[in-house]
């Protein structure tokens, strides 16, 4: 039975993606989010299960993330300088994905070798997973979107599939992690077993993504006119200089950094909030289950919102919702129902940015071509990822710094007032401020309206130089 022709999108660009292609591509994000969710829970594991100092852990995380961010830039440079004729992106899904699954187990096997020895161990394992293996998989994977299809419509759908699949992965692991590890005994050995399960899942997801991905836009065995053209190789320093003079790329960089701070806070704050404000850390599983509702609604509604409002207005509406929800939560912070309700609205508010960061980055890459005559695909993605990595690291570290500032003691049975204020600070006040800043920045992103004319100009230049 022959497949139904895909046709062209509303801009007249040939479509090449079917459901199986979207699904296979999205498994890469599933693997990446499984890794990032694990890292987001490490503060709790290190402080409450291993007994390490919160301040030391917070500083360790931000040091690791800074190193991690710079390895993003290095990885982007490596990919952009891959010799012509070789695949740039797909091979890294296996080269990094399989070792990452193994290292995920080592994250929890912290030996009893003294405070300094433990800090050294967790620093090395965190750098290995996040700065080396996660980066070596994420940068090529993010770049695949640009070469897989020329259709802005399909890129948007890819972004939604990736965000939805990745978010589901994060939510599943966040919901299951505490109840399962508690059921397995609640000690370090229980977390090691859970890490082994997650590692196997990451390896399988990386294998599926590798098997289904392509570096050319193909459909039904036919190669469609979508491929990366050979372009002048620009020195790394010069490429970065050009990117920082692209205001749209800078906006994406900063907003991605800020949104990842919120993700980092959300992944780690819930367990502290449930344990010390509501008195039961198992409630984090309940919150995770409730959080699936706005997540599903977000992924269902983000497409119609983008179609109706466009990229920028969709983000502005979502950021306004997030800010409003956190303002209301300030006045109802000790009521579980309100925490769940306004937390759900905050969750909904983060979905559009998840879906659109790749689309906005691709738009800024198109602007690179318009302004400079070169796209710098991998370097653009890696430098944008730089912001995301620093953001998620800051999100995790902010929790530790707040707790360290008030002398957090995990052995107490009742939280002092200072500990509660610290939790309110990183769980409510910080996200509120970030939503306001993101609203202001995205309001300056006017590329969406002018991009079609820019693409026409690029096409004319290419025709003249042909």
Q: What is each residue range found by the language model?
A:
Residues 2-466:
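Membrane-embedded alpha-helical bundles of multi-pass transporters/translocases
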């Amino acid at each position: 039975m022959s497949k139904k022709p895909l046709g062209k999108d509303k801009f007249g660009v040939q479509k090449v993606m079917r459901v199986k292609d979207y699904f296979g591509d999205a498994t890469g994000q599933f693997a990446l989010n499984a890794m990032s969710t694990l890292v987001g829970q490490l503060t709790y594991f290190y402080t409450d299960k291993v007994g390490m100092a919160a301040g030391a852990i917070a500083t360790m995380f931000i040091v690791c993330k800074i190193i991690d961010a710079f390895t993003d830039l290095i990885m982007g440079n490596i990919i952009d300088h891959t010799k012509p004729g070789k695949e740039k992106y797909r091979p890294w899904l296996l080269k990094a994905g399989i070792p990452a699954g193994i290292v995920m187990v080592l994250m929890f096997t912290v030996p009893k070798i003294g405070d300094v020895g433990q800090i050294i161990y967790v620093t090395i394992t965190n750098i290995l997973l996040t700065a080396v293996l996660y980066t070596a998989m994420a940068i090529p994977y993010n770049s695949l979107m640009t070469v897989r299809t020329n259709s802005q419509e399909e890129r948007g759908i890819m972004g939604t599939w990736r965000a939805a699949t990745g978010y589901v992965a994060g939510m599943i692991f966040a919901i299951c992690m505490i109840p399962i590890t508690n059921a397995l005994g609640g000690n370090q050995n229980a977390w090691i077993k859970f890490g082994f399960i997650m590692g196997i899942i990451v390896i399988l997801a990386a294998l599926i993504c590798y098997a289904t991905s392509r570096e050319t836009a193909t459909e039904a065995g036919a190669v469609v006119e979508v491929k990366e053209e050979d372009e002048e190789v620009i020195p790394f320093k010069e490429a970065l200089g050009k990117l920082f003079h692209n205001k749209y790329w800078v906006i994406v960089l900063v907003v991605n950094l800020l949104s990842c701070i919120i993700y980092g806070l959300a992944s780690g704050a819930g367990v502290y909030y449930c344990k010390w404000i509501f008195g039961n850390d198992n409630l984090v599983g309940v919150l995770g289950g409730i959080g699936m509702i706005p997540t599903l609604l977000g992924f269902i509604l983000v497409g119609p919102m983008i179609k109706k409002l466009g990229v920028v207005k969709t983000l502005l509406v979502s950021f306004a919702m997030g800010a409003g929800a956190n303002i209301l939560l300030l006045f109802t912070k000790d009521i579980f129902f309100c925490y769940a309700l306004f937390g759900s609205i905050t969750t909904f508010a983060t979905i559009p940015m998840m879906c659109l960061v790749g689309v906005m980055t691709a738009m800024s890459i198109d602007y690179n071509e318009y302004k400079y005559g070169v796209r710098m695909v991998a370097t653009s993605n890696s430098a944008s990822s730089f912001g995301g990595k620093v953001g998620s690291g800051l999100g995790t570290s902010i929790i530790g710094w707040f707790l360290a500032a008030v002398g957090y003691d995990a052995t107490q049975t009742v939280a002092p007032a200072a500990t509660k204020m610290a939790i309110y600070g990183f769980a409510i006040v910080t996200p509120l401020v970030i939503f306001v800043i993101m609203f202001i920045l995205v309001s300056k992103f006017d590329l969406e309206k002018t991009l079609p004319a820019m693409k026409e100009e690029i096409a004319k230049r290419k025709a003249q130089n042909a």
